[in-house]
UniProtKB/Swiss-Prot annotation:
Name listed for the protein in its UniProt record: Apoptosis inhibitor 193R
Organism encoding this protein: Invertebrate iridescent virus 6 (IIV-6)
Keywords: Apoptosis, Early protein, Host-virus interaction, Inhibition of host caspases by virus, Metal-binding, Modulation of host cell apoptosis by virus, Repeat, Zinc, Zinc-finger
Intervals holding Sequence repeats: 134-139, 140-145, 146-151
GO molecular function annotations of the record: zinc ion binding
Similarity section: Belongs to the IIV-6 193R family.
Function statement: Plays a role early in infection by preventing host cell apoptosis.
Compositional bias (Acidic residues): 10-23
Length: 208
């Protein structure tokens, strides 16, 4: 694995000293090409099929194909990598090289937080407290009505935690200053808040 240069290396947006952690969120760069997964995946139409990692893995890690050998570039921080090996994990390589080069890639940080949330939280429908309640209700037919109410409440909770843009992912980002939420994928495609239509300049992690 090797880097092949980065753009905007002198841009304060990408310096660790200006990552916004001390002033209520990370400043986000908007209106970037290839902000969506599908757009990035389409850039790999000429990706040699025999090469690994796959174009899907690279796209999910934020990369687009430059149509030169196996060179790819992050849509957000412009990090460029080449000379991929079969054992390489695109996201881990992205994370490693941005850390080594002291690039503050908000896309990498967003995926890392989303992975943390997935690894440390139970599914809405597999909450251990809810499961225990449901088990107790199964043994008591007189409480069937309460069981239905509990299940409806659980479903409602899941709806609240679902991104209202894609209706697929869990919300993990807060738009600043309006306070509305988004998932880690949709936030990079937004120009204004889709709920209140106001502009936002930063995002922050949402702990639920």
């Amino acid at each position: 694995m090797d880097t092949c240069g980065i753009y905007n290396s002198d841009n304060e947006e990408f310096s660790q000293e200006n990552d916004g952690e001390n002033d209520g969120g990370d400043k986000i760069i908007k209106n970037l090409p290839f902000a969506s997964y599908d757009e990035r995946l389409n850039s790999f139409q000429n990706w040699p099929i025999q090469l690994l990692p796959s174009k899907e893995q690279l796209s999910r890690a934020g990369f687009i194909y430059l149509n030169i050998g196996d060179q790819v570039q992050c849509f957000y921080c412009d990090l460029k990598l080449k000379e991929w090996k079969r054992s390489d994990n695109p996201f881990e390589e992205h994370k490693k090289h941005t850390q080594d080069l002291k690039i503050n890639c908000l896309f990498v940080k967003s995926i890392e937080f989303d992975n943390f949330v997935k690894n440390h939280s139970e599914s809405c429908f597999q909450n251990p407290i809810t499961n225990n309640i449901n088990q107790d209700l199964d043994h008591n037919q007189d409480l069937d009505h309460n069981q239905d109410l509990d299940q409806n409440s659980t479903t409602s909770d899941c709806d609240v935690l679902t991104c209202k843009i894609c209706f697929t992912n869990k919300i993990t980002k807060v738009l600043i200053p309006c306070g509305h939420s988004s998932c880690y994928e949709c936030v990079f495609k937004l120009q204004t808040c889709p709920i209140c239509k106001n502009n936002f300049i930063k995002i922050n992690n949402l702990f639920i």
